[in-house]
Swiss-Prot record:
Family: Belongs to the conotoxin A superfamily.
Transmembrane residue ranges: none
Disulfide cysteine pairs (residue numbers): C27-C33, C28-C40
Keywords: Disulfide bond, Ion channel impairing toxin, Neurotoxin, Secreted, Toxin
Protein's UniProt name: Conotoxin Bu22
Domain notes: The cysteine framework is I (CC-C-C). Alpha4/6 pattern.
GO cellular component: extracellular region
Tissue specificity annotation: Expressed by the venom duct.
Length: 41
């Protein structure tokens, strides 16, 4: 059942990275934030 907890952790990590991606996208469309963010190109 280690595999089951690995699956849960992977799902949590996917959700966390989705949230980061949404936050970065929102920041990059907002000029005062985009200017400060190295993640916006």
């Amino acid at each position: 059942s280690d595999r089951a907890s690995d699956g849960r952790n992977a799902a949590a990590n996917d959700r966390a990275s989705d949230l980061v991606a949404l936050t970065v996208r929102g920041c990059c469309t907002y000029p005062p934030c985009a200017v400060l963010s190295p993640l916006c190109d």
